[in-house]
Structures are given as structure tokens and as C-alpha cells.
Amino acid sequence: EDISTEKASEYYKIKSDEFNKCPKAELMNGIILLMEKIKASGLKILVVTGSAQHTLIRKLTHDLNGLVEENMIVTALDVKHGKPNPEPYLKGLQKAGVKPWEAIIVENAPLGIRAGVAAKVFTIAVNTGPLPDSALLNEGANILFHSIREFAEKWNK
């Protein structure tokens, strides 16, 4: 059923208030190191998230020490279809001004990997959770690492 814009705003405020009460999420171990190596390689960093939380996006740009610019983030508000549809990644390619063969996608979720593969981009799986490796590889990931730190340490190799 459709709800009014006023009611949707009310629900969004409640959701945001609850989100802000949660303990601060820690960055993934090695993410700053990986992003610094990516930047040093001359590549652009773009974040594609299924979130539409403004507070989360502001936190992301702040916590990543300026490694991600706000105009280089694709959120749920930028697309009609989220992952596993490739639209979020295609929008990211457009924002970055690159072709699929000029990009890589780093993903930790099966639906995100499926979206990356559908966008025809080399897709790297990082298993950051309890899923078996096969759950990520079976979606078409080109390579798999077991942590962001492992990926960062192997970046130049």
C-alpha cells in the first residue's frame, strides 16, 4: 500500500534515530591501507552502497580520511533497481567516467557479486563474514580474498 510523503518522512526519521543509537561500526581491518594503495596506483575510488542513510554516507566520507569523495558514492537514491541488478555499478562506472574493462569491483555479498558480474566488471570477492567461499565464487567472482587486509597486502604482487 502507498503511504504519504509525510508518513514516509516520519518512518525515515524513526529509522535514522534508531540507527544513530547503534554503537559506532568499526572500519574493516585493512580498508584504509587498501584504499591508499588503490589511490597510489592512480585509480579512482567509488563506493556503491544499497543504503540511502544520509548519516551513514556522511560517516563514510569522514571515517575514510577523505579517500572517498561524496560525489563518488552511488546510493539507493541514485538508482531504480538495487543489487543484484547491475544498475548501481553501471551508474558508478558512469560517475567515474570509466568503461567496465577499466574498473574492478570489490564485494563481500553474493548479490553484489552477481551485480558486478552482470555489469561486466572484474569482480573481486572478499569473504568478510560467515558465508562459505562457494557462496561468493558461485556468483561469478573472478578471485576471492579472505579479508580486506589480505587483499591490501597482495595489491602490488
Each model region followed by its residue ranges:
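Asp-based, Mg2+/Mn2+-dependent phosphohydrolase catalytic module
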Residues: 32, 36, 52-157
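Residue-level recognition of short, well-ordered coil/turn positions
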Residues: 2, 42-43, 97
